[in-house]
């Protein structure tokens, strides 16, 4: 699943290396608009609906955090 997440992130912002272990929000790799686009893409790709209460910067700060959020929403 992590490779799929990295692919989605790279398509969204190709100028960054999302395989790094850094905070994507803190490092300026993702902004609020990017997070909205990412949520839409994740919803469509994985057939889920991420709840608005889960759209918090800390849930999108790393590949691992995004994976945890997806698992919370039933993605295996």
Go through each PLM region and give its residues.
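C-terminal structural segments of small proteins and small subunits
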Residues: 52-75
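Aromatic/hydrophobic pocket-lining residues that form π-stacking "cages" and hydrophobic walls in ligand
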Residues: 39
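Catalytic nucleophile serine of serine hydrolases
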Residues: 32
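Thiotemplate assembly-line natural product biosynthesis machinery
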Residues: 1-17, 68-76
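Conserved catalytic core of two-component sensor histidine kinases
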Residues: 36
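Phosphopantetheine carrier-protein modules
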Residues: 10-29, 47-56
């Amino acid at each position: 699943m992590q490779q799929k997440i990295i692919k989605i992130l790279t398509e969204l912002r190709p100028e960054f290396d999302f395989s790094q272990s850094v905070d994507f929000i803190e490092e300026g790799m993702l902004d609020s608009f990017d997070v909205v686009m990412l949520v839409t893409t994740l919803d469509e790709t994985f057939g889920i609906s991420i709840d608005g209460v889960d759209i918090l910067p800390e849930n999108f700060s790393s590949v691992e955090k995004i994976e945890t959020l997806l698992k919370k929403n039933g993605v295996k």
